[in-house]
């Protein structure tokens, strides 16, 4: 305490109201990060005072009056913690509550302090038999600990927690295990005050006197935390009531008595003391606190006054303070003349940049009590009066008990209007003349412009939620082409965890990831849960589909079955309240780590680093340096995802500092330097540690998580063209440099450094307009880098699940804080542009096709025979007959409407149960070489035994006689046949391929349901009827058998070729349909066995398919569009 220290200001604290009596101050403390002094009173009210003048800043009710006085404060960067007898309160410094924690176990809490986890966790205790650990972020009790003593004060010093007991003892607790490692006897009564700093602990307390009961001891006890021994006490003859250790001078303490006498002493030399006296007049001292900076202290008296002492020239509270946020200054409105003729729009609106409070989100708006419907005028004009009112004759214009909608919410601009079903369009086109058809086509073109409309928040409609609608014909009747007229396929929704669609699209259009995924998929990998294989299958399907809709069901099913996906909150069903932007960023980190690990399992690495690691890994060395002793430890570090870190709020708000560029943000994020508390092996205690990364190399694909959490970061992204489409990176002697714009061009012109140029491939964006829309994710992707044309131009597309549209680059990279923000960004080296590697097609590992994988003995050769490598190796054009059987894994969801109609919300979900593939030609034509039963691990709703031939137990590995294999095992065989160029022959294959989740080009499909079809009859014929009518065979007598169905389809194809060669195809088809009309298209003796079970679509049974048909032309492609087989020359 210097000579110029004196009392600077006295603040009177009184509760709200007109002249109420003063409420005693129960505790107070200086803020550790801002120029604030916090006080709490006996009624639970918390008040803060700002700066040396002690101006009132905030005041709020932290605890109920019944909870008693506020006992203690603790401070974090985000807020203020306070504790009372039965509750713990956490609020922002502005007074807004973050959480308030109560529990029946909180009976008499007294104190709290931070644990070894820093400000993330606190330990609370009191005069009761339990202590509690509380998570500060979540506001929940995470652990309950039994305790033998009752604690009243708790202080932390280094690795110890010092707790004063109710009986005057001091317990020294280990901050990690919270076990008592030393007990001191401090005072014979209770302890009035205690403080600990560095290596010293000082206490004041009470002792009993014969005549005066309990009195303050005339000394202060001192203990060494270094040796855990008691030192000589410091005398203080007027009675030591309060003691505080100086925050900067480790051996200096300030002792105060209740009458206001203060003494500054050196614990190592107690004889040299500096005395001061506080003028208290008619009160006594109730509290004493030292500022963290050591430049001020405060005293509270019994009259609710706070006295601030310090040097007028140096006084400040924390050592390093952050700016305190104040309310905006309200500008008084200008005076204006007001009359009845003054228009209201002259008042105007204040400038605002956030959603107004009056703009309620859609999920908070509810319709209650619709107005009654208006009575028809014809009824009112014919009413007759009676004693009980009026009555009129019913005009019979409405149905009985018909519900009338009297309030329609205007939602036309909030969601995309679904198109007509294909069956509706087909029926409508048949009834229109040519002129009317052109008019309808023009109207549909105008309807397509609806995708370019905007909602009430200026959100383009193409960003809205898209949903699949289902008619009685199932999903095949939905017009996906309305949403996508590009050569790039979208991904369907209504699949669990389909929020990952946007990220999977981003991987598919990143050539380096795409090439390695397909290279791994072509390897002999047979791990059941390999996500990299599933990613390769999905990418190959998207490329082959070339604009047709696809679904990622197999990938998402494998992903959902991973146990660590649940613990990381990556599954929608287990994380309903987690924001999608957080889930997709966590998924990005998880998938990159997983596929890198899986790639290393199959393909060799050089020096421990695989090709996938070189593509994805940022190699770095992480160093941790102790701020106290400068001891430094270095360890290797690598990461697949770099998370962007933004400047602090006060830096972003400073208008004199220029806004940071994207390259500056990226540099600070990659070289991320943090300060945190950690264990120093040299100091042998927790110290402030400085963490820093030294970059060794950067990958070919730079994956970034936007990690936007503050409003200032959102405003940064809203700056036009803030996100560059090209960046340059230089790594030199461990330093990471990033450039963009003119700086990048300048470095490229100079050519001094080896600079890697990256181009932006795409962005996953979070869309949250709030207008009757659920938050969802979209991807804006530049398809130019993944084009096979070396000179392909940049073309940006929006991928909103199955909606795909070309958009300008400006629109793709435009972000709005209110509804569109980036989540994941992908940059790829420009040297990898257009490097599409298809060499995997020549390196397919086909060993799975020639081996018997079951432990059961091989079936007889007349029932099953594996392919012979030398004579039967699959080749382009080799025909194979295929049929699959399915089971129902989930029932359909149906909504019954008030008018009695039903609408399918989500169709039933089926799973592959058995797949059989037979030879299509050669000596053993018709003999199967694949007949796999698929093991099922999830619950089966219905085995559909009558239509699938699958019985309970057939798909269980423990009980099945068929040795079922994994879905991936069976799928890979079909995938290999597809990429070897085989032609698949079967009946109604579209539904089979969709459930299997594989896309086969039309040139490789021979579908007998399309061969024996006349468009004029609008009905497709089932396999059993065709076998009876064309082949004169009876099939499916007892149950369905996939081998029998596949060989029957093969025979029908051969018979079709005979009809074509003989030139009698058309009369034969007419005869077949004529015969079918006579027997109702059922094979005699079949009864109703061929009717479909509830929930199965017509496509799967070979019935009427709603897709629009055109007259086939001879020589066209196969599959219902042409007559010639792809096998014929």
Swiss-Prot record:
SMART domains: EXOIII (SM00479). Residues 458-830 form the USP domain. It is found in: Cytoplasm. Residues 396-427, 1083-1129 are annotated as: Disordered. One of its GO terms (cellular component) is P-body. Its cofactor is a divalent metal cation. Its main location: cytoplasm. A divalent metal cation binds at residues 883, 885, 992, 1045. PROSITE patterns: USP_3. GO terms for biological process: mRNA processing; nuclear-transcribed mRNA poly(A) tail shortening. Residues 320-457 are annotated as: Linker. InterPro entries: Exonuclease_RNaseT/DNA_pol3, PAN2, PAN2-PAN3_catalytic_subunit, PAN2_N, PAN2_UCH_dom, Papain-like_cys_pep_sf, RNaseH-like_sf, RNaseH_sf. WD repeats lie at residues 20-60, 104-146, 148-183, 186-226, 280-319. Its EC number is 3.1.13.4. Residues 880-1052 form the Exonuclease domain. It catalyses: Exonucleolytic cleavage of poly(A) to 5'-AMP. Keywords: Cytoplasm, Exonuclease, Hydrolase, Metal-binding, mRNA processing, Nuclease, Repeat, WD repeat. SUPFAM superfamilies: Cysteine proteinases (SSF54001), Ribonuclease H-like (SSF53098), WD40 repeat-like (SSF50978). GO terms for molecular function: metal ion binding; nucleic acid binding; poly(A)-specific ribonuclease activity. The keyword Metal-binding applies. Binds 2 metal cations per subunit in the catalytic exonuclease domain. Contains a pseudo-UCH domain. This ubiquitin C-terminal hydrolase (UCH)-like or ubiquitin specific protease (USP)-like domain is predicted to be catalytically inactive because it lacks the active site catalytic triad characteristic of thiol proteases, with residues at the equivalent structural positions that are incompatible with catalysis, and it cannot bind ubiquitin. It functions as a structural scaffold for intra- and intermolecular interactions in the complex. The linker, or PAN3 interaction domain (PID), between the WD40 repeats and the pseudo-UCH domain mediates interaction with PAN3. Catalytic subunit of the poly(A)-nuclease (PAN) deadenylation complex, one of two cytoplasmic mRNA deadenylases involved in mRNA turnover. PAN specifically shortens poly(A) tails of RNA and the activity is stimulated by poly(A)-binding protein PAB1. PAN deadenylation is followed by rapid degradation of the shortened mRNA tails by the CCR4-NOT complex. Deadenylated mRNAs are then degraded by two alternative mechanisms, namely exosome-mediated 3'-5' exonucleolytic degradation, or deadenylation-dependent mRNA decaping and subsequent 5'-3' exonucleolytic degradation by XRN1. Forms a heterotrimer with an asymmetric homodimer of the regulatory subunit PAN3 to form the poly(A)-nuclease (PAN) deadenylation complex. Belongs to the peptidase C19 family. PAN2 subfamily. This is PAN2-PAN3 deadenylation complex catalytic subunit PAN2. It comes from Phaeosphaeria nodorum (strain SN15 / ATCC MYA-4574 / FGSC 10173).
């Amino acid at each position: 305490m210097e000579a110029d220290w004196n009392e600077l200001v006295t603040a009177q604290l009184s509760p709200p109201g007109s002249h109420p009596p003063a409420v005693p101050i129960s505790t107070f403390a200086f803020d550790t990060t801002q120029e604030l002094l916090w006080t709490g009173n006996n009624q639970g009210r918390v008040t803060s005072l700002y700066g040396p003048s002690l101006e009132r800043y905030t005041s709020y009710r932290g605890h109920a009056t019944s909870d008693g006085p506020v006992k203690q404060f603790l401070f974090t960067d985000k807020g203020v913690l306070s504790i009372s007898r039965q509750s713990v309160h956490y609020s922002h410094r502005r007074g807004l509550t973050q959480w308030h924690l109560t529990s029946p176990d909180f009976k008499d809490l007294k104190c709290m302090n931070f644990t070894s986890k820093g400000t993330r966790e606190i330990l609370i205790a009191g005069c009761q038999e339990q202590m509690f650990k509380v998570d500060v972020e979540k506001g929940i009790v995470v652990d309950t600990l039994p305790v033998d003593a009752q604690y009243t004060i708790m202080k932390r010093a280094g690795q110890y927690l010092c707790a004063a007991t109710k009986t005057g003892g001091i317990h020294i607790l280990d901050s990690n295990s919270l076990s008592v490692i030393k007990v001191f006897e401090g005072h014979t009564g209770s302890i009035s005050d205690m403080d600990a700093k560095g290596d010293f602990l000082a206490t004041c307390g009470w002792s009993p006197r014969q005549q005066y009961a309990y009195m303050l001891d005339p000394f202060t006890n001192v203990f060494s935390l270094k040796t855990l021994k008691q030192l000589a006490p410091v005398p203080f003859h007027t009675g030591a009531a309060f003691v505080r250790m100086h925050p900067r001078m480790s051996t200096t303490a300030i002792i105060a008595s209740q009458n206001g006498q203060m003494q500054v002493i050196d614990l190592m030399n107690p004889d040299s003391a500096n005395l001061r006296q506080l003028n208290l007049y008619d009160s006594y001292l109730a509290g004493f606190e030292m500022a963290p900076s050591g430049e001020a202290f405060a005293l509270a008296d019994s009259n609710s006054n706070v006295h601030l002492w310090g040097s007028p020239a140096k006084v400040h509270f924390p050592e390093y303070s952050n700016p305190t946020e104040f309310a905006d200054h309200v500008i008084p409105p200008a005076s204006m003349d007001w009359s009845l003729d003054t228009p209201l729009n002259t008042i105007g609106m204040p400038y605002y940049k956030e959603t107004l409070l009056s703009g309620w989100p859609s999920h908070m708006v509810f319709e209650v009590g619709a107005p009654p419907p208006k009575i028809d005028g014809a009824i009112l004009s014919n009413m007759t009066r009676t004693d009980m009112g009026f009555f009129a004759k019913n005009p019979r214009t409405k149905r009985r008990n018909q519900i009338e909608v009297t309030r329609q919410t205007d939602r036309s601009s909030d969601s995309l209007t679904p198109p007509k079903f294909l069956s509706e369009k087909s029926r409508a086109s048949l009834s229109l003349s040519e002129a009317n058809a052109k008019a309808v086509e023009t109207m549909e073109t105008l309807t397509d412009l609806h995708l370019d409309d905007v909602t009430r928040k200026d959100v383009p409609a193409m960003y809205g939620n898209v949903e699949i609608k289902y008619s009685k014909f199932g999903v095949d009747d939905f017009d996906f082409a309305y949403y996508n007229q590009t050569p790039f396929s979208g991904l369907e929704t209504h699949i669990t965890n389909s929020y990952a669609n946007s990220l999977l699209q981003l991987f598919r259009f990143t050539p380096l990831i795409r090439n390695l995924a397909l290279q791994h998929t072509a390897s002999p990998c047979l791990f059941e849960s390999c996500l990299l294989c599933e990613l390769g299958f999905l990418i190959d399907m998207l490329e082959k589909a070339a604009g047709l809709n696809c679904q990622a069901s197999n990938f998402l099913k494998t992903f959902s079955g991973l146990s660590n996906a649940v613990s990381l909150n990556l599954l929608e069903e287990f994380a309903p309240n987690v924001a999608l932007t957080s889930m997709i960023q966590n998924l990005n980190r998880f998938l990159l780590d997983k596929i890198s690990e899986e790639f290393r399992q199959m393909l060799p690495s050089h020096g421990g680093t695989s090709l996938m690691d070189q593509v994805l890994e940022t190699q770095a060395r992480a160093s941790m340096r102790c701020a106290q002793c400068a001891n430094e430890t270095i360890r290797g570090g690598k990461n697949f995802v770099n998370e962007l870190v933004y400047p602090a709020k006060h830096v972003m708000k400073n208008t004199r500092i220029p806004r940071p560029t994207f390259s500056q943000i990226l540099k600070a994020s990659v070289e991320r330097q943090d300060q945190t508390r950690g264990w120093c092996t040299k100091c042998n205690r927790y110290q402030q540690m400085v963490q820093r990364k030294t970059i060794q190399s950067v990958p070919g694909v730079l994956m970034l998580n936007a990690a936007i959490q503050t409003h200032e970061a959102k405003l940064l992204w809203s700056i036009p063209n803030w996100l560059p489409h090209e960046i340059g990176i230089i790594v030199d002697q461990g330093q990471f440099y990033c450039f963009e714009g003119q700086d990048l061009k300048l470095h490229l012109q100079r050519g001094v450094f080896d600079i890697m140029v990256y181009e932006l491939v795409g962005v996953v964006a979070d869309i949250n307009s709030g207008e009757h829309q659920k938050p969802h994710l979209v991807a804006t992707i530049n398809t130019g880098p993944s084009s096979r044309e070396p000179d392909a131009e940049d073309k940006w597309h929006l991928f909103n699940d199955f909606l795909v549209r070309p958009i300008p680059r400006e629109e793709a990279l435009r972000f709005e804080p209110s509804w569109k923000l980036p989540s994941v960004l992908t940059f790829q080296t420009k040297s990898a542009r257009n490097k599409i590697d298809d060499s995997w097609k020549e390196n397919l590992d086909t060993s799975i096709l020639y081996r018997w994988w079951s432990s059961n003995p091989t079936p007889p050769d007349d029932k099953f025979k594996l392919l012979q490598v030398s004579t039967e190796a699959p080749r382009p054009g080799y025909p194979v007959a295929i049929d699959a059987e399915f089971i129902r894994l989930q029932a359909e969801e149906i909504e019954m409407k008030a008018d009695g109609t039903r609408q399918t919300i989500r169709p039933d979900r089926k799973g592959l149960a058995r797949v059989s593939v037979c030879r299509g030609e050669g000596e053993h034509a018709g003999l199967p070489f694949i007949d796999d039963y698929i093991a099922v691990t999830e619950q089966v709703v219905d085995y559909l035994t009558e239509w699938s031939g699958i019985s309970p137990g057939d798909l269980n590995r423990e009980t099945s006689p068929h040795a079922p294999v994994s879905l991936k095992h069976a799928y890979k065989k079909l995938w290999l046949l597809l990429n070897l160029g085989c032609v698949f022959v079967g009946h109604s294959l579209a539904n089979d391929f969709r459930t299997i989740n594989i896309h086969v080009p039309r040139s490789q499909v021979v579908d007998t349901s399309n061969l024996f079809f006349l468009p004029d009859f609008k009905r497709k014929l089932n396999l059993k009827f065709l076998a009876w009518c064309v082949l004169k065979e009876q099939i499916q007598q007892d149950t369905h058998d996939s081998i029998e169905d596949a060989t029957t389809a093969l025979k029908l194809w051969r018979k079709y070729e005979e009809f074509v060669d003989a030139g009698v195809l058309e009369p034969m088809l007419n005869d077949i349909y004529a015969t079918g009309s006579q027997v109702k298209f059922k094979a005699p003796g079949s009864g109703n066995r061929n009717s479909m079970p509830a929930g199965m679509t017509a496509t799967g049974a070979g019935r009427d398919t709603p897709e629009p048909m055109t007259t086939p032309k001879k020589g066209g492609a196969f599959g219902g569009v042409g007559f010639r087989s792809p096998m014929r020359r």
